[in-house]
Amino acid sequence: MPVRQLPETVVNRIAAGEVVERPASVVKELVENAIDAGAGRIDIFTDGGGRRRIGITDDGGGMTKADLALAVDRHATSKLDDEDLLRIRTLGFRGEALPSIGAVAKLGITTRHGSEPHAWSLTVEGGRKSAIVPAALTQGTRVEVSDLFYATPARLKFLKTDRTEAEAIREVVRRLAMARPDIAFTLAGEERAPVTWTAALPGAAGQLTRLGDILGADFRCSAIAVRAERDGVTVEGFAAAPSLTRANALGQYLFVNGRPVRDKLIIGAVRAAYSDYLPRDRHPVVALFVTTAPQEVDANVHPAKTEVRFRNAGLVRALIVHALKEGLAREGRRTAANSDGAVLTAFRPAAVPRPANWDWRQSPASPVGAGPWSGGATAAAFAAPGQTAFDVGAPSADVRSDPNPVADLIDRPLGAARTQIHETYIVTQTRDGLIVVDQHAAHERIVYEKLKAALERDGVQRQILLIPDIVELDEATVEKLIDRAPELEKFGLAIESFGPGAVAVRETPSLLGKTNAAALLRDLAEHMAEWDEALPLERRLMHVAATMACHGSVRAGRILKPEEMNALLREMEDTPNSGQCNHGRPTYVELKLADIEKLFGRR
């Protein structure tokens, strides 16, 4: 077959395959055009998941009649100078998206520029343009796309259900709305109820408002502001507290010079920053905005511009890690579970039907045991064999000598301990509310931070066992543990082989007190089996510290004396990142007095 020049319509359809993959691609290109045109409000409507119809109206600058005629031609744009490809400041090119859409769908454009006496309208069907005619429109541009892929029926077979395509459109609009909180967006369609995001005020407060509207109230309540800057690159945004996580990384958003992008760079950087706070199977929610000179980032890696390439990717990654770590350390005691809707709902009484003549005085009473303030059995339980004590500092000495410790401690950040419930949770009173502390989670974080500090300082102090503990394990596990013995020794855990199927434990970390060496070694072996060989030594050591902290912490079900509860609270106040345990769970929840009064109808 001889070589021949393809018709223009065929060329456009081939080009459209790179830009217009699905209805969401059309919405992305058209909304980006509206943003570039200076729109303050953008309305999007879809029908049939965008397959039957897509309509986008903006109040931007619009186009003149001459510009409209050129905008639907390939390689025609108002957004580039001759040599601007390496300094792109806009989101898209009208001459890139519109011809591609017009090649595979029925396209209608109505637009009015401020210099024109009226609007102009143009249609494109299968790549063929109509004449430009006068139309009615106050200001801006209205674009309507119908019968998507009618000119390329084979592409229709690859589309998902209307609901799935509508959800993809929604995600595209969500990302663009997060990138531009100063623009009002409305998204409507037959698939779901309309949603409107009003324009937010300039600055970080407005940005957080928009992020909260899209990512939810939980994110807004737990969001931590982060920022880092170096060598002309700025990273800023908001990160959720470690107690707000997801099962995947879909809640991590990256914007580069106002452009939403997907990049594996952020996933690795965020994982590194949160490594001290979350288990490996949980992912935090973050929204980060990178600003840099246009020539420092290549936005033309992909025709759809969903990926970028940084000239100095290492610097960007380092800034992301630094910004997140600094923010998390600064807000270490914050938790996502403070006075949010879920906590209030849990406190509201359930609607349990009772007889009209029900009298609480005639109901059977539950036996009431001695509370922790009564001593006696409490002290004996605390001294039970096998339990690990935590340090009792100076504040607890005051508690023992003061008959009314609440008055002295109520103004502390975590207040004064009032009681312990279910031998697991400490209830404290603060000046403006109450706090419930998970004693195991809280002490686990304290022990973990102490192990880290000791490792950085001069090593973890050890306690020599008079009689070594012999732990029987399978041979493969023994081999793995012995291979990692030098790393374990850094934490004061000295082990050696004791035959083909056993390990002798000769020294344990003093911080752990009396610990179950067999259970500790088995847990360590399980975690080591999951390690990637490429995992850096520092990360391996932190995994060891986390496992040891779990075993060396005060357990749920252990009764505490009041001085011990208050000592734990004071240690929490002095410990970085004490708002979450090593697994990302909150160590406490707080309920403000105002919220309590609402529950009882006093407000």
From Swiss-Prot:
Q: Which GO terms describe its biological process?
A: mismatch repair
Does the record carry Chaperone as a key word? no
**Where does the source fall among the domains of life?**
Bacteria
Intrachain S-S bonds: none
Q: Does the keyword Zinc apply?
A: no
Q: Which keywords are on file for this protein?
A: DNA damage, DNA repair
Question: Which function does this protein serve?
Answer: This protein is involved in the repair of mismatches in DNA. It is required for dam-dependent methyl-directed DNA mismatch repair. May act as a 'molecular matchmaker', a protein that promotes the formation of a stable complex between two or more DNA-binding proteins in an ATP-dependent manner without itself being part of a final effector complex.
Q: What is this protein called?
A: DNA mismatch repair protein MutL
Organism, per UniProt? Nitrobacter hamburgensis (strain DSM 10229 / NCIMB 13809 / X14)
